[in-house]
Amino acid sequence: MYTKYQIRRTTRHKAVLLEKKKKNNMEKMKDLAYYNGKITSIDDMMIPANDRGFYFGDGIYEAAMVFDYKIYALQDHLDRMFNSAAMLRIELPYTKEEVGALLTDLVQKLESSCQFLYWQVTRGTSPRNHLFPGEGVSSNLYVYSKPWKGAQMSDEYRLISIPDTRFYHCNIKTLNLIPNVMAAQQASEAGCNETVFVRDGYVTECSHSNISMVKDGVFITHPLDNLILPGTERKHIIRWCGELGIPVKERAFTLEELYTADEILVTSTSHPSMRAMELNQKAVGMKNPELIQKLRDKYLNEIGK
């Protein structure tokens, strides 16, 4: 018997697929971590202190849901991963197909069939220096997967808004998340679930989610640009709207418009349909439950629930 795929780099920084024998009676794991070919439990994984992810947050990441050992929207996550790497000029010594094969193999090793899967790539391991490492230093791939209770949906999301002071490359899924961390903490301390970023009068996104609204039967969401992350769930909702005959407008909208929206929908990979009922302590949305349910049904149908 063989495990399927394991990525390692050659001295020419090209990936090769290596098949590794395993015993028939190998037990499944509670959780799993992977780092450049080594597999352990999450708590036992050791990562070099000179990994540039520690010094500079010099890397990118992705997170996906796993249902019945199948990675939901895997291709979308791989496309975004490679786009982010290209924008940061991080060289990836493997193809999308190789990464996808590795991830697909890793999630099979856990006891739980429903998982939260995370992976990141950093610019490599080298002594601290702001400049890119020289030749001979290849990127590092870290993966972990753990049991998950499943994608979350709610009709009771509470939001606050703050100025969006992040940098102008929010379309890159970078490890640099301090503004998002601070914003998420601010929401929690206010007794809320998420923070809405507002830049120059316009709503952009949330601390770890996209945000959209429904007004007069039209689904309205911020256009893809450098101010928001191209969310995978956002992408699929737009597709589902097309299938359901729901008009879509990709345009910037103001906080004032959000207050008067018929529905406010906060979306992410792990929280695909969070319906907001409060914004800055004011009641909002909750006026078109039928439309929201249609979108939720599309999601549940796709994950096989």
Each model region followed by its residue ranges:
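Short, Lys/Arg-enriched N-terminal segments with co-localized hydrophobic residues
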Residues: 9, 13-28
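Cationic, low-complexity basic patches in intrinsically disordered or flexible, solvent-exposed regions
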Residues: 5
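Helix-start/capping segments and mature chain N-termini
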Residues: 26-108, 131-305
